A protein has these predicted regions:
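Short acidic, glycine/serine/threonine-rich helix-capping segments at coil-helix boundaries
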Residues: 3-13, 17-59
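Active-site acidic/histidine clusters and adjacent loop/turn architecture
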Residues: 57-96
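Short, conserved phosphate/pyrophosphate- and ester-handling motifs at nucleotide-, phospho-/glycolipid
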Residues: 34, 103, 127
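Second-shell loop/turn segments in exported
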Residues: 2-6, 26-29, 66-76, 139-146
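Extended, low-complexity, intrinsically disordered C-terminal regulatory tails
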Residues: 85-115
C-alpha cells in the first residue's frame, strides 16, 4: 500500500488522475509532469496544508495516510480523527489511520493475498480514488485487529457530514473502514476517476 503521498506520485498517471478527480487538473493523463501538473500539485499541497492548520495533525503514520487522500477526504478524516483520538484515549487506547489511498496495482496485490482481506480488485474500492481510510486500534505499539473500540470509534462517523462507515454495511461489514460519501457507488467513483 502507498505509504505516503510521495509513493502515490511515483505513478505519474495515477497522480494526474488523482489531481483531476480532486478538481485541480484539467490536462492530459499522459504521465508527463509538466506546468499544468505541477501547478495542480502545488494547489493540492496548499489546500492540504491549510486543512492541517485548521483541523490539526496526528501521529506520523496517520499523517502519511491522510496525505494520500483527496483534500476533501483529508478534511473529513481529520475531523473524525480528532474526535476518535479523544474518545480512544479516554478508554486507554490509541487510534491511527493505517491505510489511505491505494493504487489499482496495490489493490490487486492486496486482493491476491491469502487469507482474503478484501473483496475488491483494483478500481473496485473507494481507497483507489483517495476517498477512503482504514483505522486501527492500539495500546502503545500493540495492534488490536478485533476490539469493541472499532464500533465505538466507527460510530463517530455521524459527526462528520458526508462520511459513511463500513460498520453499517449489510453485505460486508468493515468496521475499520470510513469513506467520503461523494458517489452513490464504487462504479460511479471509478467512472469519474477514469474520465
Amino acid at each position: 500500500m502507498a505509504d505516503s503521498l510521495a509513493d502515490i506520485k511515483k505513478d505519474r498517471r495515477f497522480w494526474q488522475r488523482m489531481l483531476r478527480f480532486a478538481g485541480y487538473y484539467d490536462g492530459a493523463i499522459d504521465g508527463i509532469l509538466g506546468t499544468k501538473s505541477k501547478a495542480a500539485a502545488a494547489a493540492w499541497d496548499e489546500d492540504a496544508q491549510r486543512i492541517k492548520e485548521v483541523y490539526g495533525t496526528f501521529d506520523e503514520r496517520t499523517e502519511r495516510n491522510i496525505s494520500t487522500l483527496i483534500p476533501q477526504a483529508q478534511r473529513a478524516a481529520r475531523v473524525w480523527c480528532a474526535e476518535a483520538v479523544r474518545v480512544a484515549k479516554e478508554s486507554g487506547f490509541d487510534v491511527r489511520i493505517i491505510c489511505g489511498t491505494r493504487t489499482y496495482k496495490e489493490q490487486d496485490a492486496l486482493y491476491a493475498k491469502r487469507p482474503r482481506v478484501t473483496k475488491a480488485r483494483g478500481g473496485q474500492s473507494m481507497h483507489n480514488f483517495g476517498l477512503a481510510w482504514d483505522f486501527g486500534v492500539f495500546q502503545g505499539k500493540t495492534y488490536f485487529g478485533d476490539s469493541p473500540m472499532y464500533a465505538v470509534l466507527g460510530k463517530l462517523y455521524k459527526l462528520v457530514p458526508s462520511v459513511e462507515w463500513g460498520g453499517t454495511w449489510k453485505s460486508f461489514v468493515d468496521q475499520p473502514h470510513l469513506q467520503l460519501n461523494k458517489y452513490p457507488n464504487t462504479a460511479a467513483a471509478r467512472a469519474a476517476f477514469e474520465s
